[in-house]
Amino acid sequence: MTGWSCLVTGAGGFLGQRIIRLLVKEKELKEIRVLDKAFGPELREEFSKLQNKTKLTVLEGDILDEPFLKRACQDVSVIIHTACIIDVFGVTHRESIMNVNVKGTQLLLEACVQASVPVFIYTSSIEVAGPNSYKEIIQNGHEEEPLENTWPAPYPHSKKLAEKAVLAANGWNLKNGGTLYTCALRPMYIYGEGSRFLSASINEALNNNGILSSVGKFSTVNPVYVGNVAWAHILALRALQDPKKAPSIRGQFYYISDDTPHQSYDNLNYTLSKEFGLRLDSRWSFPLSLMYWIGFLLEIVSFLLRPIYTYRPPFNRHIVTLSNSVFTFSYKKAQRDLAYKPLYSWEEAKQKTVEWVGSLVDRHKETLKSKTQ
């Protein structure tokens, strides 16, 4: 496609930034529109440095602002929709999550139709598939298995509804008489430089004598490096613009993993930080079944206090299940249809992430140093 343009929502986020860095290398791409609620000065400067033959246009606005979305979509060839509220701990109000993640996606699809944008790629989540029970074991799962998250928690529920809306929109008629083609990518838990979940775990450990909190010692998962997830998006947009490949991809979803070893969340955090003296918590912990029922009791307490006080439990049944299940998936379908092969090996991904973790450790040391002066 000659002289095409791409809109990336959530472009200021952990994944969005990595997609932009790869997008600027695409041939015949004349413009990238980077959309988010707000961009800090450092990120604006980074985007300006990325500009070469490809124009980068920064768009600050609300995903629920219909006129703004219609303007953003004008003369765009491809949309990569990563923008969403990620919240597994119940900090954000349910209505806000549903509005941004579901209504925002629906409004963007409608703007696509009005602006006649033919390609729409949605960043979904592994949580769309589950896990629904820590007793359920899924190893090397695939797209043909009828897996669907049944938790009422707002984040997985909203991502499930949004993905369904995106895939149902495949084949819609566009205003110019063309057709809208869509697909969705379901990445595993994403790690890498800039991960706020990994950053929170490391900083918490640094403030706790180097002891990493146990978040999922009973789990077996296959986390995916952020650079490989970004690469999968590039391959998806290429494939949906390829007349030979596109028919088998339209309306489909794909699990995105890589060659990161299958391990627990706790072991991943330890592997990425042990070089700096951080260590796993060796203290005795409650059995998983007991943790599940304690989570249930905390939910009841939260519900009973709701009329007079907002109590957010440290964990609930959903978090216990999410963090302690055997839940791994294959990327064979993405390999077959998208020609997906991880851009970064496990060793490369580990090295880059460990270097970034080292910068967090150095920053912590500098903070302590300044406090003692």
From Swiss-Prot:
Pathway: Steroid hormone biosynthesis; Steroid metabolism. GO terms for molecular function: 3-beta-hydroxy-Delta5-steroid dehydrogenase (NAD+) activity; 3-beta-hydroxysteroid 3-dehydrogenase (NADP+) activity; 5-alpha-androstane-3-beta,17-beta-diol dehydrogenase (NADP+) activity; oxidoreductase activity, acting on the CH-OH group of donors, NAD or NADP as acceptor; steroid Delta-isomerase activity. It is a single-pass membrane protein. The lineage of its organism: Eukaryota, Metazoa, Chordata, Craniata, Vertebrata. GO terms for cellular component: cilium; cytoplasm; endoplasmic reticulum; endoplasmic reticulum membrane; intercellular bridge; intracellular membrane-bounded organelle; microtubule cytoskeleton; mitochondrial inner membrane. This is 3 beta-hydroxysteroid dehydrogenase/Delta 5-->4-isomerase type 1. The gene is HSD3B1. The chain crosses the membrane at residues 288-308. NADP(+) binds at G10, A11, G12, G13, F14, L15, Y155, K159. It comes from Homo sapiens. Keywords: Endoplasmic reticulum, Isomerase, Lipid metabolism, Membrane, Mitochondrion, Multifunctional enzyme, NAD, NADP, Oxidoreductase, Steroid metabolism, Steroidogenesis, Transmembrane, Transmembrane helix. Pfam families: 3Beta_HSD (PF01073). It catalyses: a 3beta-hydroxy-Delta(5)-steroid + NAD(+) = a 3-oxo-Delta(5)-steroid + NADH + H(+); pregnenolone + NAD(+) = pregn-5-ene-3,20-dione + NADH + H(+); 3beta-hydroxyandrost-5-en-17-one + NAD(+) = androst-5-ene-3,17-dione + NADH + H(+); androst-5-en-3beta,17beta-diol + NAD(+) = 17beta-hydroxy-androst-5-en-3-one + NADH + H(+).
